[in-house]
A protein has these predicted regions:
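Conserved catalytic/switch belt of AAA+ P-loop NTPases
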Residues: 128-129, 134-157, 167-172
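Short regulatory helix/loop adjacent to the ATP-binding pocket of P-loop NTPases
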Residues: 98-102, 159-175
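Walker A/P-loop nucleotide-binding motif
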Residues: 49-70
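C-terminal helical "lid" of AAA+/P-loop NTPase domains
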Residues: 194-198, 210-217, 224-239
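Conserved AAA+ ATPase "SRH/arginine-finger" region at the nucleotide-binding site
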Residues: 163, 176-189
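Pre-Walker A (pre-P-loop) alpha-helix and adjacent loop at the N terminus of AAA/AAA+ ATPase modules
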Residues: 19-55, 74
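Structural recognition of the conserved hydrophobic beta-strand(s) that form the central parallel beta-sheet
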Residues: 87-88, 120-122, 150-156
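Short glycine-rich substrate-engagement loop in P-loop NTPases that contacts/grips substrate
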Residues: 77, 81-118, 128-131
Length: 249
């Protein structure tokens, strides 16, 4: 590991990682539903390309895949700022490939990606039916793996359930480590909600326990929806000029 780190110290990053700085391991709430995925993500962030490559994380939307992808990148950059890391959605990847074809810069795009230390690609299912983009990704994937660099992929389905993506890519996804993320159990969802309230920055806001429990029971299957309901409550509290929210609000 030390030799790996030293070999990177001389390199100067020349790219924007496109990471969300607020998505870290420190503010990722861990429970039984996501513990294995979080442990694997933390491991590859500190030892990229060493053993578990690619890492494939899957779940329904809104359960933390994007957060973990960014946490990997942020932790890796914190450990070694010279690492070349890129977070990108598969939709944006497709757009980049299309643009490179139009501008005759596919060689530059290929060189750019193959030299990354860590590629974090979100929602790989949207490569469905994109022949040229899939071809480019296949070759980039092979180069990164062969260079002992790290790829982390997320999807709304496990590899075997992906439709419209070439079998050779599916086979490579399955060659690494895969973990699913389940909807959070009640305690984890409530802890996530409490963290979201803390992040609002309004220390005077009081939301009673029965309101929190009601929100969790109705929206725990989708953390984004849970967060959306919290923001709605926060907005309404501002409109009503109150910092106290109970079931009568």
């Amino acid at each position: 590991v030390e030799e790996y780190k030293k070999s990177k110290q001389k390199r100067v990053p020349k790219i924007d990682s496109h990471l969300h700085p607020d998505m870290t391991f420190a503010n990722f709430i861990v429970g039984n539903s996501n513990r294995m995925a979080q442990n694997a993500a933390l491991l590859v962030s500190t030892k990229p390309g060493m053993n578990f490559n690619p890492l494939f994380l899957y779940s329904h939307p809104g359960l933390g895949k994007t957060h973990l992808l960014n946490a990997i990148g942020n932790k890796a950059k914190e450990t070694n700022p010279n690492l070349l890391v890129r977070y990108i959605t598969s939709k944006d990847f497709v757009d980049e490939i299309i643009n490179s074809i139009k501008t005759n810069t596919t060689d530059e795009i290929y060189s750019y990606y193959r030299n990354l230390d860590i590629l974090l690609i979100d929602d790989i299912q949207f490569l469905f039916g994109k022949e040229k983009s899939s071809e480019m990704f296949f070759h980039i994937f092979n180069e990164i793996i062969n260079n002992n660099h790290q790829i982390v992929i997320t999807s709304d389905k496990m590899p075997d359930e992906l439709q419209g993506i070439e079998e050779r890519l599916i086979s490579r996804f399955k060659s690494g480590l895969s973990f699913g993320i389940d909807p959070p159990e009640f305690e984890t969802a409530k802890a996530i909600l409490e963290k979201k309230i803390e992040n609002l920055g309004n220390t005077d806001l009081i939301i009673t326990d029965d309101v929190l429990d009601f929100m969790v029971m109705n929206y725990c299957n989708d953390i984004r929806s849970l967060e959306g309901q919290l923001k709605r409550l926060f907005f309404c509290s501002i409109m009503e000029s109150t910092n106290y929210i109970d079931m009568n609000f």
